[in-house]
């Protein structure tokens, strides 16, 4: 097919990217404008390519409007952290910045296996980027129409294989980064050169839409590969990485009321040798760059390109561009996707402690000084921290002689909670209110008490030691990955959600809508009824989602492009 569509049809985002001078826009000038706390015009969108979103505190909107003040505009920054690995020294740097320079004082672990700062005012932005640079970090391409933070299976049980997978996650991230010098010029006072920027992979208008990549090590699907555009499934031989199965075209975002949008599982393309990894990654990205829909952003992601052009045609184009033929998919299987909490011994004789961080929000609470505790551990720990795609944190690489001291610190500060149930650990939410401008309903602030109510139901049916994969997302964009949950709540309005049921425990089946626009009480009543039936009628080891499908309570989504709305 032709590589270009008629220019008149392009969305306005294509115009602003093309006119941005390789993502510079007039961001530097806006930084000097003290009359507003935000960025104007195109810059509002362009700062996303630099890893930031412009937000405001929605709890304060009405009050500030009454006082004739503009909203409390602030920025959220998402760090680029391939595979979620961060050193204790880096952690201490971000800990201090969050405490001293942000409105909320917290560090937010996210489903993109990195951390976010929320509530950064415009005068603090340059110092924030320069701090990250000094720490060896950045936020390049963690938002916008680019390849975003690359996820990698984070549990280091198989340390050699995990290390190899993580090295490839870093290589893929670096290879697909924008080449523009705009970030360094604007935020790091980098030298402006006369050399014209080139973007050989992403192109002068970058990608049609955001693009997400994972490296996953079976049997753990902790990264939820089917939520991502490009996935490399590690294939090993005698514990050594030998290549990847490649899956393309996953994604969960949709638009309420628009049946041309839907979640989609990734399609299997085939197996590749390690040496072909970067060639295939580049070929998938450039094919999506040239074939993706640049006129309608709601249908611009890779999943829609595969449906419009055909999986076979897309796959063949990737082979041509890469000069690589896909071999048949090699056997792989997933058995779980949750994090393995507590101490796990690696094959290197070091120990790894996975901590449950509810909602990923690291802050000092009256009964749990999580932020202080992690800072104290960082001052003592000789290994690293690994953030997980489930919003939790691993203290990795602990010597046996240091285990007791690390655990004592974690317990003292409430980082280890023996009372946290399997259900609570299997539940997750996106940020939503008060900072996300897209949120239609609560998610992070709603989840803890909602889970308590679900726990009561589970206990009443003799299910206290069981779990249901439960996800809450504040809008249909899907950051909480509700469209791969056994129970998925998608915000519709304040206090109301669409309820999806019937996903599976390992993240390989999309749930189906069960009730639309219902209240918390209605949702809990449905969970009470279906969990009770599950307890009475399930087969040995049968999960909640699998039971719902077998019992005919929901029909499975088999081919979401065709049957998601049936």
Curated annotation (Swiss-Prot):
GO annotation, biological process: cysteine biosynthetic process; hydrogen sulfide biosynthetic process; sulfate assimilation
Top-rank taxon, per record: Bacteria
Keywords: 4Fe-4S, Amino-acid biosynthesis, Cysteine biosynthesis, Heme, Iron, Iron-sulfur, Metal-binding, NADP, Oxidoreductase
Reaction(s) catalysed (UniProt annotation): hydrogen sulfide + 3 NADP(+) + 3 H2O = sulfite + 3 NADPH + 4 H(+)
Record carries keyword Metal-binding: yes
Binding residue positions for siroheme: 479
Biological role stated in the UniProt entry: Component of the sulfite reductase complex that catalyzes the 6-electron reduction of sulfite to sulfide. This is one of several activities required for the biosynthesis of L-cysteine from sulfate.
Family: Belongs to the nitrite and sulfite reductase 4Fe-4S domain family.
Protein known as: Sulfite reductase [NADPH] hemoprotein beta-component
Source organism phylogeny: Bacteria, Pseudomonadati, Pseudomonadota, Gammaproteobacteria, Enterobacterales
């Amino acid at each position: 097919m032709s590589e270009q569509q008629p220019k008149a049809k392009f969305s306005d985002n294509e115009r602003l990217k093309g006119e941005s001078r390789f993502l510079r826009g007039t961001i530097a000038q806006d930084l000097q404008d003290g009359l507003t706390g935000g960025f104007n015009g195109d810059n509002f969108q362009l700062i996303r390519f630099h890893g930031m979103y412009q937000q405001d505190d929605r709890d304060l909107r009405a009050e500030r409007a009454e006082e004739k003040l503009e909203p409390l505009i602030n920025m959220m920054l998402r760090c680029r952290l391939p595979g979620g690995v961060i050193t204790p020294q880096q952690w201490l740097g971000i800990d201090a910045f969050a405490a001293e320079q942000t409105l909320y004082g917290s560090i937010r672990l996210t489903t993109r296996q990195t951390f976010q700062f929320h509530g950064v005012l415009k005068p603090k932005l340059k110092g924030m980027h320069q701090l990250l640079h000094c720490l060896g970090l950045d936020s390049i391409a963690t938002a916008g129409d680019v390849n975003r933070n690359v996820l990698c299976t984070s549990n280091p049980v198989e340390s050699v294989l995990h290390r190899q997978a993580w090295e490839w996650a870093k290589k893929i991230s670096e290879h697909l980064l924008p080449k523009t010098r705009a970030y360094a010029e604007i935020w790091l006072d980098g030298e402006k050169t006369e050399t014209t920027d080139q973007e050989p992979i992403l192109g002068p208008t970058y990608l049609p839409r955001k693009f997400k990549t994972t490296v996953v090590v079976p049997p753990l699907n902790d990264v939820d590969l089917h939520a991502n555009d490009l996935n490399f499934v590690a294939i090993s031989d005698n514990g050594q990485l030998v290549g990847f199965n490649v899956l393309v075209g996953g994604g969960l975002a949709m638009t309420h009321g628009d049946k041309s949008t839907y979640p989609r599982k990734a399609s299997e393309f085939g197996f590749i040798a390690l040496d072909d990894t970067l060639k295939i990654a580049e070929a998938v990205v450039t094919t999506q760059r040239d074939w993706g829909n640049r006129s309608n952003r709601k249908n611009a992601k890779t999943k829609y390109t595969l449906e419009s052009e055909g999986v076979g045609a897309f796959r063949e184009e990737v082979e041509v561009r890469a000069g690589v033929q896909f071999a048949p998919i090699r056997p792989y299987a997933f058995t779980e996707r949750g994090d393995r909490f507590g101490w796990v011994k690696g094959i290197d004789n070091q120990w790894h402690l996975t901590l449950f961080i509810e909602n990923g929000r690291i802050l000092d609470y009256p009964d749990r000084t999580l932020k202080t505790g992690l800072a104290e551990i960082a001052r003592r720990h000789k290994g690293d921290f690994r953030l997980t795609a489930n919003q939790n944190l691993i203290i990795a690489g602990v010597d046996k002689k240091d285990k007791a001291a690390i655990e004592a610190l974690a317990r003292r500060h409430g980082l280890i909670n023996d009372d946290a149930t399997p259900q609570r650990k299997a539940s997750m939410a996106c940020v939503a209110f008060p900072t996300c401008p897209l949120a239609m309903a609560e998610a992070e602030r709603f989840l803890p008490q909602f889970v308590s109510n679900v726990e009561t139901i589970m206990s009443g049916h003799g299910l206290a030691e069981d779990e249901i994969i439960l996800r809450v997302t504040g809008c249909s964009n899907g950051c909480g990955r509700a469209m791969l949950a056994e129970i998925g709540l998608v915000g519709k309005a304040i206090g109301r959600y669409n309820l999806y049921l019937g996903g599976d425990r390992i993240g390989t089946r999309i749930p189906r809508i069960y009730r639309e626009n219902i209240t918390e009480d209605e949702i809990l009543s449905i969970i009470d009824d279906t969990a009770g039936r599950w307890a009475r009628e399930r087969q040995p080891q049968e999960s909640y989602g699998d039971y719902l499908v077998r019992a005919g309570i929901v029909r499975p989504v088999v081919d979401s492009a065709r049957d998601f709305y049936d």
